Amino acid sequence: MTMADRIVVMDASVAVARLRAEEHTPQILGAFREWSRAGTRLIVPRSFWWEVVNALAVGWGYSGDQVLESVHELEVLGIESRDADRGQLLLTISAVERFRITAYDAQYLILAETLVAPMATLDRSLARAAGARALYLGPGDPGHRLSEPPAVYEHDVTWPNYKGASAYLAKLRAEAARPA
């Protein structure tokens, strides 16, 4: 992979921290500078933008003009949005159950796994679920010593037990095989 091909999946927590003056903002800004220097493509699931708006407007009380300015600030960074397909939806269901994370967080994990890319986050639970793929940018560590790989505590996956799973998967495979 060349420098121009380098990608990072970034979750909304990193973007919101970049926009706000928080204690770990210098580390976040440093990561963005490095990504810019390296020509790294920042890729997010389409829902990223709604998460950013929600965090700023509801979580931090930003006015509409402040939210729009913030979204524009992120937009000029060239962040690329991706839609999830049905296969990624199934992987998301599995990740939610295995790692006990939200479906929104699982989208970032599945996108990073699909793209074989690192995933930048400030979310400790998401970083633990991502394991070696995580670029944890928050304070401290995500719950493990940096000298050893994180322990990923997975739970049993039950969705394959659904009696209609085989038929549904066959339908998805047939849809995927059809020319676009």
Predicted regions and their residues:
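Short linear interaction segments
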Residues: 149-180
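Short, well-structured N-terminal submotif of metal-dependent ribonuclease cores
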Residues: 1-44, 59-67, 168
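Alpha-helix capping/helix-boundary segments
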Residues: 14-15, 48, 88, 108, ...
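Short beta-strand scaffold positions
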Residues: 10, 43-44, 83, 103-106, ...
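Acidic catalytic patch
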Residues: 46, 68-98
